């Protein structure tokens, strides 16, 4: 709506050429074997005179045995299938400009004249190769009591070789990151889904489901030197999401307090301010939660129906820039002692000489105290566990008698709410799902907007 309007134009084009083959075998309709092979050529990894390969050949094999078709398992077991498989997956860079610099024009950059510039903030890498993921998986599909109860369990073990990521680059380079193949990341875990039909009559039905996943990750290798790889950092620059050999994926590696052997924070003798650990960072947590939980239930009574879905994660941590700023500026509830700021407060910990803290921090010094803690990443680390009502719906199926004489065969009206509220949330003042980067840099939050709560009306008509 402004008088002078500007515009921009960008052009992206990428292509994957593939050769694919598969074969399927069956034995007496209860044993099945499938094998595949595929070769992909990625345009995003292709460059004239490039020595590193731009393609990858990967295969897979899966075997399933429907034991309930060849064994008498009694009346209790309705269906039983065992499955196992090995698979490989390959991929290229997302951007078609990952291998070379791209240039653009910045309008009215100097005295009204256009200026040329380098587009993008990532240093290209001509030696990037396709990443590869290898996985072994075993599972069981069990259904019981005339399919009223089903259990689907899976164990997996995989490794990702040469993942294509943007690692942190020195600010003096003029770029924010550099493209690289990350060494070797392993993941193993279990997935469990249980479904049950609890009750069913002509007028009433009640179904429920529970799902659980747990993943164990490890950084097996990073680069040729085995050094740490930094992925991202908050604007406070006192912490980095770092891949460290032998540790779990996505370590929050940052500044911390000096502590005594008992774990108490050590404070300066002169003014009682906590002492930061100089010259060394440590692992303060891990941004990727290893465990996910879910519960769903649906009900039907005559023409009315309702459903609820509850989801949550546990075991992860998050660096909250929002809370770091609230503490620094005195807006966090922890900066207000029970007796008020005027009465001062006594920090938890010990003095440099090992003695207990007996004097309080007066109001005039409290600002200095909390401004010091802002520079220490450990202060803003929180557990990111949560459980929330992801979706709740209530619906009504309009009886066919009410639709007689109309052009509508079936009508359903539903009221649906998503992300309604938390049942539990271990973070202060933020939504743990509002981390500003959920990719290779999960675990960082910086004034992130919460996941929106939405309530809507859905009308479904069939003609």
PLM region spans:
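Extracytoplasmic gating/loop element in the C-terminal half of outer-membrane beta-barrel translocons
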Residues: 42, 313-412, 417
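Flexible glycine/proline-enriched surface loops and loop-helix/loop-strand junctions
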Residues: 121, 278-279, 289-290, 377
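Short capping/connector residues at structural and topological boundaries
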Residues: 102, 133, 169, 174, ...
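Short low-complexity stretches enriched in small and charged residues
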Residues: 105-112, 257-268, 370-375
